A protein has these predicted regions:
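Helix-helix packing/entry segments at the starts of transmembrane helices
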Residues: 115-120, 185-201, 236-268
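C-terminal-most transmembrane helix of multi-pass membrane proteins
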Residues: 260-305
Length: 305
């Protein structure tokens, strides 16, 4: 749960790719690399101490994202003037709350546990899509969502639920809501603009929370925040390239290698020891997601980067 915000993508299938690796293989490779980058972004958040100011870090992260995305925004501004700003504003504030909860979760939970709970986002989208969008769902989706939520309970171990675990579920909820709200954004809107507005429009809100939080500004957090934002931008770019190379239904399951990488990086960098409940819960979460990813989506037009 992760975590990141590249919206609904369409598929532009390529009939032939020269060389030894086909389009599906290249797409999977990009997704695997992208998810590895995203886990390292989470690791940069995890190096923070739990008592460091959360809202300051989130503000630094938003500011660095705005700096990184500004050239793309200026380049696309004339061709694609910003639209649907009220929906961008709503998504930005939901995402800001989610990022604050993400910092709380990552600084207090093992990396793999936090990521396993973040992956509940696609599962949460199933009931939310029925409730908010009035979508009809199949029995298969109900069953896969149920199995996935069983996995979440196994990871959580209800007797050990704490605020950090609830924060991780809050991250998943914010991601699910934002994924549903992306449908309110015109498909022709460049992804860079969407990412820019998602970070910038909630900066006054986060700045006010940082002022309320009090204390001196800890500028040493700037570089972890900048690094985390930069890695997420790389992840978003790799995802766009991957989904342009091959059909989403054929490669989307590669996204879930991120959870395996979170386990590996947690062991390597933070001396975490994943137990059997975590591994079993991860399986219950990932397998339904793979089943959902393999169902054929309706073709859509992809926005330009």
């Amino acid at each position: 749960i992760i975590l990141l915000d590249n919206g609904t993508r369409a598929t532009l299938p390529l009939s032939n790719m020269g060389g030894g690796m086909n389009a599906v293989g290249i797409g999977i490779l990009y997704l695997v690399l992208g998810n590895m980058v995203a886990v390292f972004s989470d690791a940069l958040v995890k190096v923070l101490e739990p008592d460091q100011p959360v809202f300051q870090f989130v503000f630094f992260r938003q500011l660095s994202a705005a700096i990184l995305l500004a050239p793309w925004l200026l380049w696309s501004w004339r061709r694609n003037p910003p639209v649907a700003l009220k929906w961008h504003l709503l998504r930005a504030h939901i995402w800001a709350v989610g990022v604050c909860l993400m910092v709380i979760a990552l600084t207090r939970l093992p990396l793999a546990t936090a990521n396993a709970l973040f992956y509940a986002a696609p599962l949460m989208m199933v009931p939310l899509a029925v409730w908010l969008a009035g979508e009809a769902i199949s029995r298969q989706k109900v069953l896969t969502a149920f199995i996935g939520f069983v996995g979440v309970l196994i990871v959580l171990r209800p007797t050990e639920v704490n605020w950090a675990a609830l924060a991780a579920l809050g991250v998943a909820l914010s991601m699910a809501l934002n994924n549903l709200l992306i449908k309110r954004i015109p498909l022709q809107q460049p992804i860079a603009q969407t990412l820019f507005f998602t970070n910038v429009l909630s900066m006054p809100f986060i700045m006010a929370l940082a002022w309320w939080e009090g204390g001196d500004w800890q500028w040493q957090m700037w570089w972890p925040a900048f690094g985390s934002s930069a890695l997420i931008m790389v992840y978003a770019g790799l995802c766009v390239v991957a989904y342009r190379k091959a059909e989403a239904s054929k490669i989307a399951s590669a996204e879930y290698t991120g959870l395996l990488m979170a386990v590996a990086i947690g062991v390597w960098l933070f001396d975490e020891q994943p137990g059997l409940p975590l591994l079993l819960g991860c399986l219950c979460i990932i397998l339904p997601l793979i089943a959902m990813a393999r169902s054929k989506p309706k073709p859509q037009v992809e926005p330009a980067l």
